Amino acid sequence: VAAGSRILFSRVGQVAANAAVVVLVAQQLGPAGQGHYSLTVAVTLLSASLLGGGMGLAAVPALRQGRVTPRRLMRAQALWMGLMSVVLGAAAWWAITDDAAASWLSLHLGWTPALAWLVAVGAFGMLGFEIFTYNLLARGRLVVGSAVNGWRALGHLLVVAALLLTGRLTPSTAVGAFAAAQLGGLVAIIVVACRDLRRPAQPINGMPGVPLAPCELPDDLDTRPLWKLAAFNPRHGALGQLSAVAYFLLLRLDQGLVEHFRGAAEVGIYSLAVYVGEMLWLLPGALTPLLVHSSAADASDPRRDRTAARAVRMGVGLTLVAALPLYLLAAPLLALAGGGQYEASVNALRALLPGIVAFAPGVVLAGDFIGRGKPHWNTQASVLTVVVNVAVALALIPRHGAVGAAWASSIAYACGSAVMLWRFRRTTGMSLRGLVLGRHRRPLPA
């Protein structure tokens, strides 16, 4: 409870800082500039997801079972990050020097040559932050990642505010502030992870003596050459990492479709609604790191499944409580982000909120599935959700624009969440009454 409260506190601060950044950028850049900014951030997210390689996901069972020392694992991860920095640098160089690529990026994303390097820096910071956050989660440091995220969001806000006050907030400097925030978060998490090497790993709180869920790992993992250890993680974490890629496509592919059919200004209108709505997921997301840790317990202990079900109920409750007033106050709140420029964002946000609430269980269960050693379940649900989203979006966006994209997302989110809840109930054998009401037929052992 204490860890969850601290994570939630950090997430609330992160939500507030992110909301302020969205408002400042949207006000200054206008719909077209906001659209280009949102699409550029999406490219950064996609690059980080593709190049993460499952290095963080694959580390969780290895660290939890003591098959590899944290110090050697970090060295292998640093080797991987070095290779990915070369890939990002080469991609940025190609985006600048290839005339066709530079022309396309300028037309659709509003890029200047310098932006390619900023995107590479931001993607490098994001993929490294994710890797080392999983290391800390595996060692029982449940709060650290959320705390650093909160400080990263605050730093991002301060930089954006300074740029605005000095009259220097442009699309390029907005992306630069975003990239600097990601790189700063990486530096902070590396410092924390290095300091953590001197501490013993923490046990599963509240579950003394509970064995870890079985996960097949080679016995010689810690004695392999560093390059083989670095190669092991992508082979065993790539499938789970596809979940991050699919999740990105779920959240941002529709913006690409909006740009294709309706232009960058419509993306700006839609992206503002998306940013505001998705901030609500930070609340149930506070429970995700707890489940990554607690759901690694053996299935023989019933507290594991009931803890996950309780987290689902809490996540839905938190999201619903925040979504109801946001639905009612959407018009005056979005007016703060640019007045009449973003009037159309109101209906898009209201169409998006039912899906935001419906997907809250999926946000929570993503951590549970990772803890069980089944991250590919997240991938399967995300892929299905993407397929539904694209199919409905292609039908609605050409005619209805941002509102059509929002309804397509809501329908897709509901489908994805339903699949994840079905998977959870099938795996645990939990009744619907137990999941929804917390009333179970069998009492917990004394």
Question: Over which residues does each language-model region extend?
Answer:
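Membrane-water interface segments that mark the loop-to-transmembrane alpha-helix transition
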Residues: 3-14, 18, 40, 49-101, ...
